């Protein structure tokens, strides 16, 4: 530490300057003591005045002498080198003023945000556990190391059973025509025609509905090679909306233990679009909103709503 301070500094003069500061403080204290005591210990007024003035002048001379000595020593002390390494203490000037730093309010806001995030995460976890999105009946509750991974039973149903389920659903709804094909092997693809309103391409994996595309009744649903077009969207915004709602319905109707009930429930929901352009909104009572009919159908009551009115 002494080596660091000695760079450009006269330590002997520095020590003498400290002693000079102490002497100056004593001299100044004696001046104020003299002023405090005033004129004393003399019988006549003239004698007291002369004694006070003489004593006061002596104290002032002492202050002047000590001050001159301190100035002389300060010139001998010297200045520390500007290249003196300050390390982390050199960063103190960069710190903001503590009174002007909103640290408490920022910490309080972060704490509230963290609590709100934890609360909503818990709600989301509970809802996801109630409406499980798992696409198979196999619930992997035990580690895979303890038991072999079983094949989901939903994916190994025989094609004859799938054909029978689709045939029964086709007979349930006279205004709905279902054409089943298997262009890629065992996986079925359905072309559902609902009256003269719309057509729906349903891609299935066994009895699990994997994807749906809704198009207008007069739109082309085939590719150039004669296969069902399962990738291109409808050219009309109304059927694009219905496609989005159908995808939401697939996530709502989930019962892995009874896949035939899932398909029947989805087809029942899809059949409610037979009056897509005839049913008014149950909330506002209008047929059109922003140029679109009510495209949403309630999953339980099958009532028609505009996309904004269902909120």
From Swiss-Prot:
Annotated GO CC locations: core mediator complex; cytosol; mediator complex; nucleolus; nucleoplasm
GO biological process assignments: regulation of transcription by RNA polymerase II; somatic stem cell population maintenance
Alphabetic keyword roster: Activator, Methylation, Nucleus, Phosphoprotein, Transcription, Transcription regulation
Residues recorded with modification N6-methyllysine: 134
Protein name: Mediator of RNA polymerase II transcription subunit 27
Intracellular or extracellular location(s): Nucleus
Modified sites of kind Phosphoserine: 132
GO molecular function: transcription coactivator activity
Pfam families: Med27 (PF11571)
Presence of the UniProt keyword Nucleus in the record: yes
Subunit structure comment from the entry: Component of the Mediator complex, which is composed of MED1, MED4, MED6, MED7, MED8, MED9, MED10, MED11, MED12, MED13, MED13L, MED14, MED15, MED16, MED17, MED18, MED19, MED20, MED21, MED22, MED23, MED24, MED25, MED26, MED27, MED29, MED30, MED31, CCNC, CDK8 and CDC2L6/CDK11. The MED12, MED13, CCNC and CDK8 subunits form a distinct module termed the CDK8 module. Mediator containing the CDK8 module is less active than Mediator lacking this module in supporting transcriptional activation.
The protein's role, per its UniProt record: Component of the Mediator complex, a coactivator involved in the regulated transcription of nearly all RNA polymerase II-dependent genes. Mediator functions as a bridge to convey information from gene-specific regulatory proteins to the basal RNA polymerase II transcription machinery. Mediator is recruited to promoters by direct interactions with regulatory proteins and serves as a scaffold for the assembly of a functional preinitiation complex with RNA polymerase II and the general transcription factors.
């Amino acid at each position: 530490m002494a080596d660091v301070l000695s760079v450009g500094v006269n330590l002997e003069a520095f020590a003498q300057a400290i002693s000079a500061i102490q002497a100056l403080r004593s001299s100044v204290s004696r001046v104020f003591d003299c002023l405090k005591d005033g004129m004393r210990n003399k019988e006549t007024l003239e004698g007291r005045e002369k004694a006070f003035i003489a004593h006061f002048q002596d104290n002032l001379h002492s202050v002047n002498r000590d001050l001159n000595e301190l100035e002389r020593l300060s010139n001998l002390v010297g200045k520390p080198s500007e290249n003196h390494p300050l390390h982390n203490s050199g960063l103190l000037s960069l710190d903001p003023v503590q009174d002007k730093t909103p640290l408490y309010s920022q910490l309080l806001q972060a704490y509230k945000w963290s609590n709100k995030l934890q609360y909503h995460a818990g709600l989301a976890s509970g809802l996801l556990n109630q409406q499980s999105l798992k696409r198979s009946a196999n619930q992997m509750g035990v580690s895979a190391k303890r038991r072999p991974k079983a094949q989901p039973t939903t994916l190994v149903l025989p094609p004859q059973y799938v054909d029978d389920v689709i045939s029964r659903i086709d007979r349930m709804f006279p205004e709905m025509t279902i054409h089943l094909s298997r262009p890629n092997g065992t996986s079925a693809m359905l072309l559902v025609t609902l009256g003269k309103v719309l057509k729906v391409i349903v891609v299935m994996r066994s009895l699990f509905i994997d994807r749906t595309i809704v198009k207008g009744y007069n739109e082309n649903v085939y590719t150039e090679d004669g296969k069902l077009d399962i990738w291109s969207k409808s050219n009309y915004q109304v059927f694009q909306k219905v496609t989005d709602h159908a995808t939401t319905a697939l996530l709502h109707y989930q019962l892995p233990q009874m896949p035939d009930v899932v398909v029947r429930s989805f087809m029942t929901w899809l059949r409610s679009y037979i009056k897509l352009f005839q049913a008014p909104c149950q909330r506002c009572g209008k047929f059109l909103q922003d140029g679109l009919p009510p495209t949403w159908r309630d999953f339980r009551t099958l009532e028609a709503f505009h996309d904004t009115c269902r909120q």
